[in-house]
Amino acid sequence: MSSREEVLSLLRGEEGFLSGQDLSRRLGLTRAAVWKAVDALRGEGYEIEARTGLGYRLLAAPDLMTEAEIRSFLAETRVVGRELRCFQELDSTNNYLKAWTGGPDGAAVTAESQTAGRGRMDRSFQSPRGQGIYLSVLLRPGLPPDRLPPVTALAGVAVCTAVERVCGVRPGLKWPNDPVLNGKKLCGILTEMSLEAETGRVQSLVLGIGINVGQRPEDFAPEVREVATSLLQVLGKRVSRPRLTAALLEELDKAYAALLAGDLSAYRAAYRRDCVNLGKTVQLIPFGGGERETARAVDVDEEFSLVVRGADGRERTVRSGEVSVRGLWGYTE
Protein backbone atom coordinates (compact mmCIF):
# COMPACT_ATOMS: atom_id res chain seq x y z
CA MET A 1 0.00 0.00 0.00
CA SER A 2 1.39 3.40 -0.96
CA SER A 3 1.74 6.25 1.53
CA ARG A 4 -1.16 7.98 -0.22
CA GLU A 5 -3.39 4.93 0.29
CA GLU A 6 -2.26 4.59 3.91
CA VAL A 7 -3.14 8.21 4.66
CA LEU A 8 -6.51 7.77 2.95
CA SER A 9 -7.24 4.62 4.96
CA LEU A 10 -6.61 6.40 8.27
CA LEU A 11 -8.67 9.45 7.27
CA ARG A 12 -11.58 7.16 6.33
CA GLY A 13 -11.47 5.62 9.79
CA GLU A 14 -11.91 8.96 11.56
CA GLU A 15 -15.16 10.90 11.82
CA GLY A 16 -13.33 14.04 12.87
CA PHE A 17 -9.89 15.51 12.35
CA LEU A 18 -6.64 13.55 12.45
CA SER A 19 -3.55 15.59 13.17
CA GLY A 20 -0.55 15.57 10.91
CA GLN A 21 1.52 14.48 13.92
CA ASP A 22 -0.70 11.43 14.50
CA LEU A 23 -0.60 10.51 10.82
CA SER A 24 3.16 10.87 10.80
CA ARG A 25 3.59 8.74 13.93
CA ARG A 26 1.16 5.96 12.96
CA LEU A 27 2.52 5.60 9.43
CA GLY A 28 6.18 6.24 10.11
CA LEU A 29 6.24 9.14 7.65
CA THR A 30 7.64 12.64 7.90
CA ARG A 31 5.19 15.53 8.21
CA ALA A 32 6.29 16.62 4.73
CA ALA A 33 5.46 13.17 3.34
CA VAL A 34 2.01 13.31 4.96
CA TRP A 35 1.36 16.73 3.41
CA LYS A 36 2.54 15.43 0.03
CA ALA A 37 0.17 12.45 0.27
CA VAL A 38 -2.76 14.72 1.20
CA ASP A 39 -1.94 17.02 -1.71
CA ALA A 40 -1.85 14.04 -4.09
CA LEU A 41 -5.24 12.84 -2.81
CA ARG A 42 -6.73 16.29 -3.37
CA GLY A 43 -5.37 16.16 -6.90
CA GLU A 44 -7.31 12.93 -7.45
CA GLY A 45 -10.55 14.59 -6.35
CA TYR A 46 -10.71 13.81 -2.62
CA GLU A 47 -12.10 16.71 -0.59
CA ILE A 48 -9.85 16.99 2.47
CA GLU A 49 -10.23 19.81 4.98
CA ALA A 50 -7.12 21.08 6.77
CA ARG A 51 -7.28 23.20 9.95
CA THR A 52 -4.42 24.59 11.94
CA GLY A 53 -4.18 22.86 15.31
CA LEU A 54 -6.65 20.13 14.31
CA GLY A 55 -5.18 18.41 11.28
CA TYR A 56 -6.97 16.80 8.34
CA ARG A 57 -10.51 15.54 7.78
CA LEU A 58 -11.93 13.65 4.79
CA LEU A 59 -15.14 15.34 3.63
CA ALA A 60 -15.92 13.58 0.35
CA ALA A 61 -14.44 11.01 -2.00
CA PRO A 62 -14.59 11.04 -5.81
CA ASP A 63 -16.42 8.40 -7.81
CA LEU A 64 -13.24 6.61 -8.86
CA MET A 65 -12.92 2.92 -9.72
CA THR A 66 -9.69 2.41 -7.79
CA GLU A 67 -8.77 -0.50 -5.57
CA ALA A 68 -8.68 1.76 -2.52
CA GLU A 69 -12.18 3.11 -3.18
CA ILE A 70 -13.72 -0.30 -3.89
CA ARG A 71 -12.06 -1.97 -0.91
CA SER A 72 -13.30 0.79 1.40
CA PHE A 73 -16.81 -0.66 0.87
CA LEU A 74 -15.89 -4.33 0.40
CA ALA A 75 -16.51 -6.89 3.14
CA GLU A 76 -14.21 -9.88 3.29
CA THR A 77 -15.00 -12.43 0.58
CA ARG A 78 -13.97 -16.07 0.36
CA VAL A 79 -12.85 -16.12 -3.29
CA VAL A 80 -14.21 -13.40 -5.57
CA GLY A 81 -12.37 -10.08 -5.39
CA ARG A 82 -9.58 -11.14 -3.06
CA GLU A 83 -7.26 -10.26 -5.95
CA LEU A 84 -8.41 -6.97 -7.48
CA ARG A 85 -6.77 -4.93 -10.23
CA CYS A 86 -8.12 -1.59 -11.44
CA PHE A 87 -7.15 0.18 -14.67
CA GLN A 88 -7.93 3.47 -16.36
CA GLU A 89 -8.41 1.83 -19.75
CA LEU A 90 -8.32 -1.66 -21.26
CA ASP A 91 -9.43 -2.99 -24.61
CA SER A 92 -11.59 -5.44 -22.66
CA THR A 93 -11.57 -6.60 -19.04
CA ASN A 94 -12.45 -10.09 -20.29
CA ASN A 95 -9.45 -10.07 -22.62
CA TYR A 96 -7.16 -9.04 -19.78
CA LEU A 97 -8.20 -12.01 -17.64
CA LYS A 98 -8.04 -14.48 -20.52
CA ALA A 99 -4.44 -13.41 -21.11
CA TRP A 100 -3.50 -13.59 -17.41
CA THR A 101 -1.68 -16.90 -17.25
CA GLY A 102 -1.90 -18.26 -13.72
CA GLY A 103 -4.46 -15.72 -12.56
CA PRO A 104 -6.00 -16.92 -9.27
CA ASP A 105 -9.54 -18.16 -8.81
CA GLY A 106 -11.83 -15.18 -8.14
CA ALA A 107 -9.44 -12.54 -9.51
CA ALA A 108 -11.35 -9.39 -10.51
CA VAL A 109 -10.44 -6.62 -12.94
CA THR A 110 -12.13 -3.26 -13.52
CA ALA A 111 -11.54 -0.46 -16.01
CA GLU A 112 -12.77 3.12 -16.19
CA SER A 113 -13.29 2.57 -19.91
CA GLN A 114 -12.99 -0.16 -22.54
CA THR A 115 -12.02 0.40 -26.15
CA ALA A 116 -13.33 -2.97 -27.37
CA GLY A 117 -15.99 -4.06 -24.89
CA ARG A 118 -18.10 -6.97 -26.12
CA GLY A 119 -21.45 -8.54 -25.32
CA ARG A 120 -23.17 -11.74 -26.36
CA MET A 121 -22.91 -12.83 -30.01
CA ASP A 122 -19.81 -10.61 -30.29
CA ARG A 123 -21.89 -7.43 -30.21
CA SER A 124 -20.12 -4.22 -29.20
CA PHE A 125 -20.69 -3.04 -25.61
CA GLN A 126 -20.32 0.73 -25.20
CA SER A 127 -18.03 1.57 -22.27
CA PRO A 128 -17.72 5.36 -21.89
CA ARG A 129 -15.17 6.59 -19.36
CA GLY A 130 -16.45 7.15 -15.85
CA GLN A 131 -20.07 6.28 -16.68
CA GLY A 132 -20.34 2.59 -15.88
CA ILE A 133 -18.97 -0.42 -14.06
CA TYR A 134 -16.86 -2.60 -16.35
CA LEU A 135 -15.88 -5.67 -14.35
CA SER A 136 -14.62 -9.16 -15.14
CA VAL A 137 -14.03 -12.07 -12.77
CA LEU A 138 -11.87 -15.14 -13.39
CA LEU A 139 -13.34 -18.42 -12.12
CA ARG A 140 -11.62 -21.79 -11.84
CA PRO A 141 -14.43 -23.96 -10.47
CA GLY A 142 -12.94 -27.36 -11.27
CA LEU A 143 -16.39 -28.63 -12.24
CA PRO A 144 -17.47 -30.66 -15.28
CA PRO A 145 -18.96 -28.61 -18.16
CA ASP A 146 -22.49 -29.85 -17.48
CA ARG A 147 -22.44 -28.07 -14.09
CA LEU A 148 -21.61 -24.67 -15.58
CA PRO A 149 -24.60 -23.50 -17.69
CA PRO A 150 -26.17 -21.66 -14.70
CA VAL A 151 -23.16 -19.35 -14.22
CA THR A 152 -24.50 -16.46 -16.29
CA ALA A 153 -27.95 -16.66 -14.70
CA LEU A 154 -26.37 -16.65 -11.24
CA ALA A 155 -24.47 -13.51 -12.23
CA GLY A 156 -27.74 -11.90 -13.29
CA VAL A 157 -29.29 -12.59 -9.88
CA ALA A 158 -26.14 -11.24 -8.20
CA VAL A 159 -26.40 -7.99 -10.18
CA CYS A 160 -30.07 -7.58 -9.24
CA THR A 161 -29.34 -8.16 -5.56
CA ALA A 162 -26.37 -5.78 -5.52
CA VAL A 163 -28.38 -3.01 -7.21
CA GLU A 164 -31.23 -3.56 -4.76
CA ARG A 165 -28.84 -3.35 -1.79
CA VAL A 166 -27.23 -0.10 -2.91
CA CYS A 167 -30.06 1.65 -4.77
CA GLY A 168 -33.23 0.34 -3.14
CA VAL A 169 -34.72 -0.82 -6.45
CA ARG A 170 -34.48 -4.36 -7.81
CA PRO A 171 -34.06 -4.87 -11.56
CA GLY A 172 -35.88 -7.62 -13.39
CA LEU A 173 -34.16 -10.18 -15.62
CA LYS A 174 -34.92 -10.54 -19.30
CA TRP A 175 -34.11 -14.13 -20.15
CA PRO A 176 -31.44 -15.33 -20.20
CA ASN A 177 -29.27 -12.77 -18.40
CA ASP A 178 -30.11 -9.10 -19.00
CA PRO A 179 -30.91 -7.04 -15.87
CA VAL A 180 -33.58 -4.50 -16.87
CA LEU A 181 -35.31 -1.50 -15.33
CA ASN A 182 -38.43 0.16 -16.72
CA GLY A 183 -38.34 -2.26 -19.64
CA LYS A 184 -34.84 -1.25 -20.74
CA LYS A 185 -31.45 -2.95 -20.49
CA LEU A 186 -29.37 -1.86 -17.51
CA CYS A 187 -26.53 -4.35 -17.71
CA GLY A 188 -24.78 -6.76 -20.05
CA ILE A 189 -23.26 -10.09 -18.96
CA LEU A 190 -20.88 -12.21 -21.01
CA THR A 191 -19.36 -15.54 -19.95
CA GLU A 192 -16.42 -17.00 -21.87
CA MET A 193 -15.06 -20.50 -21.27
CA SER A 194 -11.54 -21.83 -21.89
CA LEU A 195 -11.07 -25.57 -22.42
CA GLU A 196 -7.98 -27.72 -22.18
CA ALA A 197 -7.20 -28.86 -25.73
CA GLU A 198 -6.27 -32.45 -24.86
CA THR A 199 -8.87 -33.32 -22.23
CA GLY A 200 -11.75 -30.98 -23.06
CA ARG A 201 -11.97 -30.07 -19.39
CA VAL A 202 -12.87 -26.53 -18.36
CA GLN A 203 -9.71 -24.60 -17.60
CA SER A 204 -11.38 -21.35 -16.58
CA LEU A 205 -14.42 -19.11 -16.97
CA VAL A 206 -14.26 -15.36 -17.43
CA LEU A 207 -17.41 -13.57 -16.35
CA GLY A 208 -17.79 -10.05 -17.74
CA ILE A 209 -20.35 -7.58 -16.38
CA GLY A 210 -21.07 -4.06 -17.61
CA ILE A 211 -23.56 -1.91 -15.68
CA ASN A 212 -24.84 1.42 -17.00
CA VAL A 213 -24.55 3.80 -14.05
CA GLY A 214 -24.24 7.44 -15.08
CA GLN A 215 -25.24 7.60 -18.75
CA ARG A 216 -27.80 10.09 -20.00
CA PRO A 217 -29.89 9.18 -23.07
CA GLU A 218 -27.59 11.13 -25.39
CA ASP A 219 -24.60 9.12 -24.15
CA PHE A 220 -25.94 5.99 -25.86
CA ALA A 221 -25.52 5.39 -29.57
CA PRO A 222 -28.78 5.91 -31.51
CA GLU A 223 -29.14 2.20 -32.26
CA VAL A 224 -29.27 1.27 -28.54
CA ARG A 225 -30.88 4.38 -27.06
CA GLU A 226 -34.39 2.94 -27.24
CA VAL A 227 -33.51 -0.27 -25.39
CA ALA A 228 -30.84 0.87 -22.87
CA THR A 229 -31.07 2.78 -19.61
CA SER A 230 -28.87 3.68 -16.64
CA LEU A 231 -29.25 4.01 -12.89
CA LEU A 232 -29.00 7.79 -13.27
CA GLN A 233 -31.96 7.83 -15.66
CA VAL A 234 -34.08 5.60 -13.42
CA LEU A 235 -33.20 7.06 -10.02
CA GLY A 236 -32.53 10.66 -11.03
CA LYS A 237 -29.34 10.74 -8.97
CA ARG A 238 -25.75 9.54 -9.07
CA VAL A 239 -24.83 6.17 -7.59
CA SER A 240 -21.41 5.40 -6.13
CA ARG A 241 -19.73 3.03 -8.57
CA PRO A 242 -17.15 1.76 -6.04
CA ARG A 243 -19.90 1.00 -3.51
CA LEU A 244 -21.98 -0.85 -6.10
CA THR A 245 -18.91 -2.73 -7.34
CA ALA A 246 -18.13 -3.88 -3.81
CA ALA A 247 -21.71 -5.09 -3.31
CA LEU A 248 -21.54 -6.92 -6.64
CA LEU A 249 -18.28 -8.68 -5.74
CA GLU A 250 -19.85 -9.81 -2.46
CA GLU A 251 -22.95 -11.16 -4.22
CA LEU A 252 -20.86 -12.91 -6.89
CA ASP A 253 -18.84 -14.54 -4.11
CA LYS A 254 -22.05 -15.93 -2.58
CA ALA A 255 -23.32 -17.14 -5.96
CA TYR A 256 -20.00 -18.84 -6.71
CA ALA A 257 -20.10 -20.62 -3.36
CA ALA A 258 -23.60 -21.91 -4.19
CA LEU A 259 -22.40 -23.15 -7.59
CA LEU A 260 -19.48 -25.02 -6.04
CA ALA A 261 -21.75 -26.52 -3.37
CA GLY A 262 -24.29 -27.61 -5.98
CA ASP A 263 -27.19 -25.95 -4.15
CA LEU A 264 -28.87 -23.46 -6.49
CA SER A 265 -32.42 -23.70 -5.15
CA ALA A 266 -32.43 -20.18 -3.69
CA TYR A 267 -31.03 -18.74 -6.93
CA ARG A 268 -33.60 -20.56 -9.08
CA ALA A 269 -36.37 -19.14 -6.90
CA ALA A 270 -34.89 -15.64 -7.18
CA TYR A 271 -34.45 -16.00 -10.94
CA ARG A 272 -38.06 -17.10 -11.43
CA ARG A 273 -39.22 -14.16 -9.33
CA ASP A 274 -37.06 -11.69 -11.27
CA CYS A 275 -37.63 -13.01 -14.81
CA VAL A 276 -39.83 -10.46 -16.58
CA ASN A 277 -40.73 -12.87 -19.41
CA LEU A 278 -42.50 -15.55 -17.39
CA GLY A 279 -46.25 -15.64 -17.93
CA LYS A 280 -45.99 -13.47 -21.04
CA THR A 281 -46.15 -14.03 -24.77
CA VAL A 282 -42.72 -13.53 -26.32
CA GLN A 283 -40.99 -13.62 -29.68
CA LEU A 284 -38.36 -16.33 -30.18
CA ILE A 285 -35.73 -15.09 -32.64
CA PRO A 286 -33.34 -17.82 -33.88
CA PHE A 287 -29.65 -16.92 -33.98
CA GLY A 288 -28.29 -17.10 -37.50
CA GLY A 289 -31.61 -16.20 -39.08
CA GLY A 290 -34.83 -18.09 -39.50
CA GLU A 291 -38.51 -17.50 -38.89
CA ARG A 292 -39.59 -15.83 -35.67
CA GLU A 293 -42.00 -17.71 -33.47
CA THR A 294 -44.51 -16.50 -30.92
CA ALA A 295 -44.84 -18.54 -27.72
CA ARG A 296 -45.73 -18.15 -24.07
CA ALA A 297 -42.91 -18.28 -21.51
CA VAL A 298 -44.12 -20.58 -18.74
CA ASP A 299 -41.11 -21.62 -16.64
CA VAL A 300 -37.34 -21.79 -16.15
CA ASP A 301 -35.86 -25.27 -15.81
CA GLU A 302 -33.04 -26.61 -13.61
CA GLU A 303 -30.36 -25.21 -15.96
CA PHE A 304 -32.13 -21.84 -16.25
CA SER A 305 -33.26 -22.60 -19.82
CA LEU A 306 -36.65 -21.18 -20.81
CA VAL A 307 -39.71 -23.41 -21.06
CA VAL A 308 -42.20 -22.10 -23.63
CA ARG A 309 -45.64 -23.18 -24.82
CA GLY A 310 -46.28 -22.84 -28.54
CA ALA A 311 -49.50 -22.08 -30.38
CA ASP A 312 -50.19 -25.82 -30.57
CA GLY A 313 -50.17 -26.07 -26.78
CA ARG A 314 -46.99 -28.11 -26.60
CA GLU A 315 -44.19 -27.16 -24.25
CA ARG A 316 -40.51 -27.27 -25.08
CA THR A 317 -37.23 -25.91 -23.74
CA VAL A 318 -35.12 -23.29 -25.52
CA ARG A 319 -31.52 -22.49 -24.60
CA SER A 320 -29.64 -19.22 -24.63
CA GLY A 321 -27.35 -20.23 -27.50
CA GLU A 322 -30.32 -21.03 -29.74
CA VAL A 323 -32.64 -18.02 -29.62
CA SER A 324 -33.00 -14.45 -28.49
CA VAL A 325 -36.20 -13.45 -26.70
CA ARG A 326 -38.11 -10.20 -27.18
CA GLY A 327 -41.48 -8.91 -26.12
CA LEU A 328 -44.25 -8.54 -28.67
CA TRP A 329 -44.02 -4.74 -28.69
CA GLY A 330 -40.59 -3.94 -27.35
CA TYR A 331 -37.47 -5.15 -25.57
CA THR A 332 -39.36 -6.86 -22.75
CA GLU A 333 -43.07 -6.20 -23.27
Language-model region placement:
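Long, positively charged amphipathic alpha-helical accessory segments at protein N-termini or as interdomain linkers
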Residues: M1-T30, D39, G43-E44, L143-P171, ...
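N-terminal lobe of the biotin/lipoate ligase/transferase fold
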Residues: S2-R165, K185-C187, V239
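A short coil-to-beta-strand element that immediately follows conserved catalytic motifs
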Residues: A107, R170-K174
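Short, ordered beta-strand-loop transition motifs
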Residues: A50-T52, K174, V300-D301
